């Protein structure tokens, strides 16, 4: 069964673009190469400029655990920790149904 992970970062005021640049450098290539990811969305909160959320859909719970223990994820956590207000909120879910389609890249 596919599982989802929702991560919410509260960044220090004005740090959102810097956190995104670090994510783009360290995590995006790892996510693109990871066969365990079925879908991934990196999102900015519309009402709060200091909140970033990510939705990750994995093939199963083991794939999620494996990715969250990779060197790339560990490097990202270290690189952004001083830009965050505190640790991220992580919510794990069982995905009952989803629809995904390829979106054009910016």
Predicted features and spans:
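Short, surface-exposed ligand-recognition loops at beta-strand->loop->(often short) alpha-helix junctions
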Residues: 10-20
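Residue-level signal for secondary-structure boundary sites
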Residues: 15-17, 62, 98
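Short, well-ordered beta-strand segments in beta-rich or mixed alpha/beta enzyme
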Residues: 3-10, 39-68, 94
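Glycine-rich beta-strand-turn "strand-cap" elements at beta-sheet edges
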Residues: 2, 39-50, 75-106
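Amphipathic alpha-helical recognition patches that constitute DNA-binding helices
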Residues: 6, 18, 79
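An amphipathic, aromatic/His-enriched active-site/gating alpha helix that lines ligand/cofactor pockets
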Residues: 25-39, 57-91
